[in-house]
């Protein structure tokens, strides 16, 4: 069993991209790292949990399990997300809703699950990672009307 002295980090979307790099960096820095993703792509030295961030009950259950095992979560890094390319008029509404569910409401679900324990322990950090496409004024999604 790992020492309770080591701090605990939780990373969403940790199976690829920035999330996977974040998982590796936190693990290297000495954190006990838990990783949420829908894909079953375990990373060595990391506790992978197959969790869909859009499923509030699943998120609550998984965070509860981490808190039972570790007692606290000091760092939450929300990296889960995906992008849709192309002009908005060609984007299916179902795709846009799925993107909001993961990118926004997924972040809300996990943050809401972790925040009460951070408040009780009077410490903790939440980092939300987003794509530059969210603020890029040249995005086709913003200038697609004629």
Residues of each region from the PLM?
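Conserved glycine-rich Rossmann-like NAD(P)H-binding loop of the short-chain dehydrogenase/reductase
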Residues: 29-44
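Conserved small/polar residues in nucleotide/adenosyl-binding loops
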Residues: 138-145
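A short, exposed helix-loop element centered on a Lys and neighboring polar residues
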Residues: 111-112
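The beta1-alpha1 cofactor-binding region of Rossmann-like NAD(H)/NADP(H)-dependent oxidoreductases
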Residues: 51-61, 93
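Residue(s) in the substrate-gating loop at a strand-loop-helix junction
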Residues: 131
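N-terminal Rossmann NAD(P)H-binding glycine-rich loop of SDR-like oxidoreductase domains
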Residues: 15, 23
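Substrate-binding pocket helix/loop in short-chain dehydrogenase/reductase
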Residues: 87-88, 92-97
